[in-house]
Amino acid sequence: ENIYVPQPNGQYGDEFYVTTDGGKNWTLLNDKMKMSSGGVEWITTASMHWCSSMAIDPNNTNKIMVVSGNGVFTCDNIWDESPEFYFFSKGIEETVPYDIISIPGGKLVSVIADYDGFVQDSAEEYGMVHNSVAGSMTGLAIAAKATDIWVKCGGSEEKPGFWYTLDAGKKWVNVTVSPFESGNVAYGGYVAVSADGKRFFWAPGNDSSIYFSDDQGKTWTKSNGGVGSKKIICDPVNPDYVYAASGSAFFYSEDGGKTFTQNMTLSVFAAARPVVAPGKEGVVYYPSMGLQVSTDNGKTFTRLDSLAACMAVGLGKGKTDSDPYTIFVWGKPTNDDSIGLYWSEDEGKTWSKVSDDQHQFGGLGNGYFVVGDMNKYGRVYMSTVGLGIVYGDLVQ
């Protein structure tokens, strides 16, 4: 039986005891011990829980390390009257990432399983967990022209799964109105938001339709078409255009997402995610039999001959402001190449490998994304199989 009791920060977690007489008597530590963040401020609202292992340092019997569900805590004075535990995880957090967005001139925002996601000034610094405390998140979108407006989705059968913020994550609002006519709880899936931030989109994970709202989730309308779409993205310039993809089709909308038309020329696979070119209208990249590119709002696509295979694509900052954006892919240029992370600085004409065969990180995992940084040239992020978000930098 699991018994959870209050810890010093008011959160409920495991009970911890010490004995100094070989186990004849035990002293509860929860009302005596102290806890600190160890410089990782998001942990201040968490507890030590799901403890699976503890180890005393054989060279220093005052020091003990405790494995918790959120990382590792260490105490250097376990035998004192008021021992202090501090968070000791430095980059070993085992998280399942679902998406990450690099805001041009702004922050880095992610969504993950279990712990909402993070808001960071840079990848090198510890960020803060979303204060929504909503749990597992599966989708994230940020308005291209109103970058303080973010939407995300997740939740479960017990809790409505759509959230939004109008102030860059300072305050999150949970939308409790279901888009379903039945009123049943909607959760999971993917989200999008128009470039001006005025229209929210949601393709719940427990439904096959796309819904949109013009009043921040107070009411929802079902889109016509786009059935089965689980990836949605809005044009970064023209709010009339919205793009969507399912496991078997690509769709585009010319009326702001009210109706979707299927593009009949593409063969797609379930995990493929469309990507739009930053600051450009109508330029869409889509993994399909290699990498496909559209310059007419998704109506027609042209395959890049320079790639034999592409499972994910992302765009990042160019070398200078006048240079085109960089393109990152998970795939391979020729059939003789190995699958991995590649990048192009010339709009896909030539490719250079970023990863190596010893560092594949299990592939793209649940999130199935490759994302370029919009503020640092040469930086790229990729999802993994339970290893968090991995990033790489160009070595000058």
Residue spans of the language-model regions?
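Beta-propeller fold detector
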Residues: 27-33, 84-89, 129-130, 173-177, ...
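Conserved Ser/Thr-centered positions that define the repeating blades of beta-propeller domains
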Residues: 19-20, 75-76, 117-121, 163-166, ...
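Blade-level signature of beta-propeller repeat domains, shared across WD40, Kelch, NHL, RCC1
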Residues: 363-396
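Structural signature of eukaryotic scaffold interfaces centered on beta-propeller domains
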Residues: 1, 47-59, 99-103, 138-146, ...
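Loop/turn-rich, solvent-exposed surfaces of beta-rich toroidal or solenoidal domains
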Residues: 6, 50-62, 67-72, 278-280, ...
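Residue-level marker for isolated small/hydroxyl-bearing positions within beta-strands
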Residues: 6-8, 67, 111, 152-153, ...
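Short glycine/acidic-enriched loop and turn motifs that connect beta-strands
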Residues: 9-12, 72-73, 116, 156-159, ...
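Conserved blade-ending motifs and adjacent loop-strand segments that build the rim/top face
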Residues: 36-42, 88-98, 134-137, 305-314, ...
